[in-house]
Amino acid sequence: MFKLFTARQHDKIWDFDGGIHPPEMKLQSSTVPMRIAPLPDQLIIPLQQHLGPEGELRVRAGEQVLKGQPLTVGRGRTVPVHAPTSGMITAIAPHTTAHPSGLAELCVHITPDGEDRWREQQPWADYRQRDKMALLDRIHQAGIAGLGGAGFPTASKLQGGLNGIITLIINAAECEPYITADDRLMQEHADEVITGIHILRHLLQPQQVLIGIEDNKPEAIAALQRALRGQDDIHLRVVPTKYPSGGAKQLTKILTGKEVPFGKHSSSIGVLMQNVGTVVAIKRAVIDDEPLIERVVTLTGDALSSPGNFWARIGTPVLYLLKLAGFKPQNPPMVIMGGPLMGFTLPSLDVPIVKISNCILAPAETEMGLSEPEQSCIRCGLCVDACPAGLLPQQLYWFSRGEEHEKARNHNLFDCIECGACAYVCPSNIPLVQYYRQEKAEIRALDQESARAAEAKARFEAKQARLAREKLARELRHKQAAVKLTDADQQTVDAAVSRLTRQSDGSESVINIPAGQMPDNSAVIAAREARKAQARARQAEKQQARSTEETTDVVDPRQAAVAAAIARVKAKKAVQAQHVTTDVAEAGSEAMAEDPRKAAVAAAIARVKAKKAAQAINPD
């Protein structure tokens, strides 16, 4: 009894809130076998076909390329693109791409040579012997991005799930009307689907693997059951048809009963999901060494006489594919890329097929009905009942129209999956999804502007801090230079101090300054005063030398004779003074007598000078 209860719990499926049941419109393309689209005259490959920045070019105009040759470099979340066939690159220029804005993006234009020659391939039949990181790099370099519509880099998603993944879900629901690409892929390539699942199991090691498929695909269900025969590690879950059961959060709720929190991804609750088309691309990349250069595209609508699914090379113009399906242009022509609920009208039929192009819908005028004008919201609440994400579409609409960005963000605008269920049930014909997309774009633009402003402010503050540091360092260097002597200046100061010391006390002692000690201004002043003293000494020596030279010049004879006469007179007066002094002493006078010795000395000096003068006159 317990085992039966466990089995029923194991096979149980849940339901999600909201959702709608629009006409399916799948039979016109799902009952026809897939066809291979011939090569067009020119392929246009946009450099950015995934969620992330475009890669760096590896080729140039005029270069010959081979099928599968990478055209850009893949690093990080940048997924490379490859040449869909062999041929010549005729141009690398902007071209209109599959985007609602109709803006041109950089594209590589290739003219096929008709040979369809592959680059060298290295198949990995023994992928289980390969390292996990090698497998991830193989998937990344093959340029694989999510083929379900989001275009998230597959290798990055798998790398983030290497640890902590409990459940691996293969999304085969394909819930949007008209689209049958995955349906036909499972019918005709079920074995490749299962092989791709085994590769993912080897990488992620999940506890369980679930395939979720809607019950409106009986042929695909039968094909998968045949491919799974004898394998009990992969479980096929058939779920009721309801739009949008193919949404990641909605299918997670259906198969596991777990709800992904607001603002989170399914990996936060241990679930990782891959689209069935992505699984086939992984198998071909790992085992066959085939990069993502083609995909299945549904061509449908009443404007086509031969709708169906085509294997189309990436870069094939939309108009070329439409002609293969018997396109009958309407007046005015209307072509939608994607489904009727989540797709968008193409700005031009010259745009190329990209990796996320799963459907081209060419409806007739009667099929789409008349376009009714938008009216005011009547607050009926039908959009709230239909929303599968549990949001308040009416409030988000008012916030978007009023440009109340923070309120829209706080009401979880970015959890909107843009499924179009709210617009489908709106009686006022309000294109709610368009408002939400525009509001998201505006918020992202504001966030980018704020980020750029914050970066600019950080750069400015860093610059100001750097300038302040440089100013302080410069002032410190100037202060140090004012007191710090060079080696030559230090030697000069030491020499001056030594000379002053020797002059003052005659010693030979040297004043030593300890190593590393910063001299003060007194040393500089002492050196300056020493230099001044030296200059004064040299000046005095020069003056003394000049005086000596003047003294040693030729003596005037007349001056010598006069000097001799004066000397004799002084000597005579000295003798007379001696006699006068004697008389005065005898008379009892108190006057002081002159010292006879001084007089004798003076007389002797006078005689010597007279003799020298006579010799100067008569040297012989």
Curated annotation (Swiss-Prot):
Enzyme class: translocase
Co-factor(s): [4Fe-4S] cluster
InterPro entries xrefs: 4Fe4S_Fe-S-bd, 4Fe4S_Fe_S_CS, Ion_transpt_RnfC/RsxC, Nuo51_FMN-bd, Nuo51_FMN-bd_sf, RnfC_N, Soluble_ligand-bd
Key words of the record: 4Fe-4S, Cell inner membrane, Cell membrane, Electron transport, Iron, Iron-sulfur, Membrane, Metal-binding, Repeat, Translocase, Transport
Subcellular location: Cell inner membrane
Main localization category: membrane
Binding site for [4Fe-4S] cluster 1: 377, 380, 383, 426
Membrane-protein topology: Peripheral membrane protein
GO BP, sorted A to Z: electron transport chain
Pfam families tied to this protein: Complex1_51K (PF01512), Fer4_7 (PF12838), RnfC_N (PF13375), SLBB (PF10531)
Free-text remark on how the cofactor is bound: Binds 2 [4Fe-4S] clusters per subunit.
Domain 4Fe-4S ferredoxin-type: 366-397, 407-436
NCBIfam families for this protein: PRK05035.1, rnfC
Alphabetical list of HAMAP family matching this protein: RsxC_RnfC (MF_00461)
Chain's role: Part of a membrane-bound complex that couples electron transfer with translocation of ions across the membrane.
Subunit composition and interactions: The complex is composed of six subunits: RnfA, RnfB, RnfC, RnfD, RnfE and RnfG.
Family the UniProt entry places it in: Belongs to the 4Fe4S bacterial-type ferredoxin family. RnfC subfamily.
Protein name in the entry: Ion-translocating oxidoreductase complex subunit C
Annotated organism of origin: Yersinia pestis bv. Antiqua (strain Antiqua)
Lineage: Bacteria, Pseudomonadati, Pseudomonadota, Gammaproteobacteria, Enterobacterales
Name of the gene this protein is made from: rnfC
